[in-house]
Amino acid sequence: MKFVDEVRIFVKAGDGGNGAVSFRREKYIERGGPNGGDGGNGGSVVFVADPQLTTLLDYRYQQHHRARNGEHGMGSDCNGRAAEDMVLKVPVGTLVKDANTGELLVDLSEAGQRWVAAKGGRGGLGNMNFATSTRQTPRFAQDGTKGEELTLRLELKLLADVGLLGFPNAGKSTFISRVSRARPKVADYPFTTLVPNLGMVQYKDGLSFVMADIPGIIEGASEGVGLGHQFLRHVERCKVLIHLIDMGAEGEGRAPLHDFDVLNAELGKYSPELASKPQVVAANKLDLPDAQARLEGFTEALRERGIRVYPVSCATGEGMQPLMDSVAEVLFTGRTEKLHVEIPAKAARAGKAKTKAAEKKALARNAGAAAATKSATKKSAAAKKAVTKKAPARKAGAVAKTSAARKAGTAAAKKAPARKSGTAPVKKAAAKKAPARKSGTAPAKKSAVKKASARKSGSSGKAAAKKASAATKRAPARKSGGGRS
């Protein structure tokens, strides 16, 4: 049977039936009252966890599931028949999620668990329900409601107690076939197992548990290399993980310690919670040549980390019982003492030194980060202050420039009179020199003028004296002449 662990389906509940509009019509009854019946309820879609199923293969090819509708109401007070619910059986451990939002709706992790995914519609009321003392002949009825519909994504997480992890061709299928009745395909090539396999392990004293074998995980599985790590969800419910290491992988260019570190790194990328689960490390294929030599180096490397290694051979069954005893102790009691060993003194000292160095580096990084944050905050504060002070500084600079310009203007104004005053004495001196020059030539002219005036005054004085004497002589004559008359 093909293993399918993820499907997308559409479910729709049935609609409710409509109420009937009917009246009583019988002989000798003239006005019969309303007798329309109610509609039936629609069927719901219900999921049930079935322990007999191990795959979602049935839903891969049938993706639409619709419940039946309720029947309509009829006359003579007859109600419609309600539809039966549609029951969808899924394997135990199925997760039902909303395909649009990815929200987890329910985890069907228990056998027989039921969950109503889509509720059916309610049937409508007939007109007989609307008759009153004032409305004795209602000619209407109520319609049924619609059923719910959803698009769901079903994901299967196998319910196993112990999970088998390892690189491809590490011997996981051989291991589960050795300890249980599971018969997976076993071949000498990688990726023989393409789907998870479950096996029931019968332990001592009637104790039993389920073991899950999943396809191999390789480096880069978180990025889609190989089959990816989509199958890791099948071991998320496991309480214990068995980490199977191939001691014969060096011929393929791999080292056991490298495989161990790579697989744990891929687990951490997928889910830190899964990586923190208890791991039982088993070194497989000890029946191969040179496997014992590789086992010593691998065991010593993990001993320095405090991890115990169980050497086994799945082909011959060597070392299987001590391994299964440790697995059962961790599973049923929760004790993990057998999974660890005492770290050697040198390794412990080296580990302490490494931890101290790592702590110092971490402290230095934290201090550097704190200093960087402080400097960044200081720079940001200084930048903010500079931004706030730039505008006033610019204003002050402008004011200073304007005041300086004004002062320069006043100084220039003051310098202009000074320049004028500086040129004025020159002009005054020139003016003084000009009169001086004029005065130097003026005495000669004045003397000449004085001489001419003296000459004129001398002649004019004589003439004036003559005129005055003549006038005096004439005046008495005029007076006397006037007196005679």
From Swiss-Prot:
Protein location: Cytoplasm
Residues where Mg(2+) binds: 173, 193
Cofactor: Mg(2+)
Composition skew (Low complexity), residue ranges: 367-385, 394-428, 437-446, 455-474
Any Pfam family: GTP1_OBG
SUPFAM superfamilies: Obg GTP-binding protein N-terminal domain (SSF82051), P-loop containing nucleoside triphosphate hydrolases (SSF52540)
Domain OBG-type G span(s) in chain numbering: 160-332
Keywords for this protein: Cytoplasm, GTP-binding, Hydrolase, Magnesium, Metal-binding, Nucleotide-binding
Domain of life: Bacteria
NCBIfam families membership: Obg_CgtA, PRK12296.1, PRK12297.1, PRK12299.1
Record family assignment: Belongs to the TRAFAC class OBG-HflX-like GTPase superfamily. OBG GTPase family.
Function: An essential GTPase which binds GTP, GDP and possibly (p)ppGpp with moderate affinity, with high nucleotide exchange rates and a fairly low GTP hydrolysis rate. Plays a role in control of the cell cycle, stress response, ribosome biogenesis and in those bacteria that undergo differentiation, in morphogenesis control.
Name of the molecule in the record: GTPase Obg
Organism, as annotated: Myxococcus xanthus (strain DK1622)
Gene expressing this chain: obg
